[in-house]
């Protein structure tokens, strides 16, 4: 009985030591090196203000290198998943990406007219175009980088605080393009022990870059000289709104003659598109939603083809530096087939002009 008990004890001890060794191995391999911001300002505003493109630059494919450069001095604290007992043997590495649509060759789509190529400066390396991964910067001991509270980084020399972006024209535009604040790029940081250049765009970014600004074009076109057009559709009997998508009996069609003028400096005809934008009626999306449920407003071209309020276009070819006319028709329709309550109704729409 005692010998058997002894063998059981030996077996249990062996199993116990094996479990301890396996746990110790798992702990030594658990550090990812990935870093995150613990406090401070992790956002860099890339606001280039208001800039104007010369006429020859407002052409598809034109690139404006280093359209805007920045050199900020954000202060923030970074903590990394690393072994604080071996912090002196570590190395910094970086990665970056963008949430914008990737067009290839490091270009990201800002909107239908513009694209950006972003270069970020990390310490010890040349400016690198986004996206990138596994960019090492050599040894740079930070004693508290593995602590939960993190290590303070800051000043204009800190990695990621400086950079630039180039601008590419995807298609020419008229007037102004306003870029509201949008996430342009994200920088990820790693501290690898033992020293290595491994770093990917996973986890939480250390810095996020927000782009904003306004770009003006010297070439310009205008619709009704930029003034508001008011359309009076008169009085209609509510009982006549009975067929979805149809103009009620007795309703009038307003025929609009809208002045259009372009001054682009180009000889010959200018090809333009008038685009219509408004809130669509959920019951009949081809109509503009009005303040009166069951009543919508339809806009057509001169051939009675409906122009969708969700970005429908009216193409025109007009002479440069001369007055021209765009013709549209406007009339009310039923959107539900149910006669609406009596009363006034209103609707608004925006007409934007683009040229090739």
From Swiss-Prot:
One Pfam family of this chain: Fimbrial
Domain of life: Bacteria
Recorded family membership: Belongs to the fimbrial protein family.
Protein name: Uncharacterized fimbrial-like protein ElfG
Signal peptide: 1-28
Organism: Escherichia coli (strain K12)
One GO term of the biological process aspect: response to radiation
Other noteworthy facts: The operon is cryptic under classical laboratory conditions, but is functional when constitutively expressed.
Function, as annotated: Part of the elfADCG-ycbUVF fimbrial operon, which promotes adhesion of bacteria to different abiotic surfaces.
Gene: elfG
A GO CC term attached to the entry: pilus
Gene3D superfamilies (UniProt xref): Fimbrial-type adhesion domain (2.60.40.1090)
InterPro entries recorded: Adhesion_dom_fimbrial, Adhesion_dom_fimbrial_sf, Adhesion_dom_sf, Bact_Fimbrial_Adh_Pro
Signal listed as a keyword: yes
Cell location: Fimbrium
Induction (record text): Expression is negatively regulated by H-NS and subjected to cAMP receptor protein (CRP)-mediated catabolite repression.
Keywords, in A-Z order: Fimbrium, Signal
């Amino acid at each position: 009985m005692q010998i058997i008990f002894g063998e059981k004890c030996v077996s249990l001890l062996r199993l116990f030591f094996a479990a301890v060794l396996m746990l110790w191995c798992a702990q030594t391999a658990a550090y990812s090196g990935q870093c995150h911001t613990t406090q401070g300002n992790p956002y860099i505003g890339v606001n280039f203000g208001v800039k104007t493109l010369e006429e020859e630059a407002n052409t598809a494919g034109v690139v404006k290198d280093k359209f805007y450069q920045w050199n900020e001095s954000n202060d923030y604290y970074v903590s990394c998943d690393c072994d604080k007992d071996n912090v002196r043997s570590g190395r910094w590495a970086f990665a970056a990406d963008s949430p914008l649509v990737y067009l290839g060759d490091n270009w990201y789509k800002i909107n239908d007219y513009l694209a950006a190529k972003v270069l970020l400066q990390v310490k010890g390396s040349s400016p690198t175009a986004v996206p990138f991964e596994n960019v090492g910067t050599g040894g740079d001991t930070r004693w508290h980088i593995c602590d939960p509270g993190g290590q303070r980084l800051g000043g204009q020399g800190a990695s990621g605080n400086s950079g630039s972006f180039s601008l590419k024209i995807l298609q020419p535009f008229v007037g102004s393009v306003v870029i509201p604040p949008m996430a342009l790029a994200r920088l990820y940081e790693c501290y690898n022990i033992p020293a290595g250049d491994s770093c990917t765009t996973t986890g939480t970014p250390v810095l996020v870059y927000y782009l904003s600004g306004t770009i003006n074009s010297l070439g310009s076109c205008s619709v009704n000289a930029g003034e508001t057009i008011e359309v009076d559709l008169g009085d209609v009997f509510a009982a006549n709104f009975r067929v979805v998508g149809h103009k009620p009996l007795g309703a009038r069609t307003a025929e609009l003659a809208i002045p259009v003028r372009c001054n682009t400096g180009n000889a010959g005809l200018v090809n333009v598109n008038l685009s219509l934008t408004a809130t669509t009626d959920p019951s009949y999306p081809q109509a503009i939603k009005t303040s009166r449920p069951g009543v919508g407003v339809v806009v057509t071209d001169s051939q009675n083809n409906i122009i969708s309020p969700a970005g429908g276009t009216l193409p025109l070819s007009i002479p440069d530096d001369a007055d021209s006319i765009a013709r549209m028709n406007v009339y009310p329709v039923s959107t539900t087939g149910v006669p609406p309550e009596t009363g006034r109704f209103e609707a608004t729409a925006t007409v934007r002009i683009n040229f090739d």
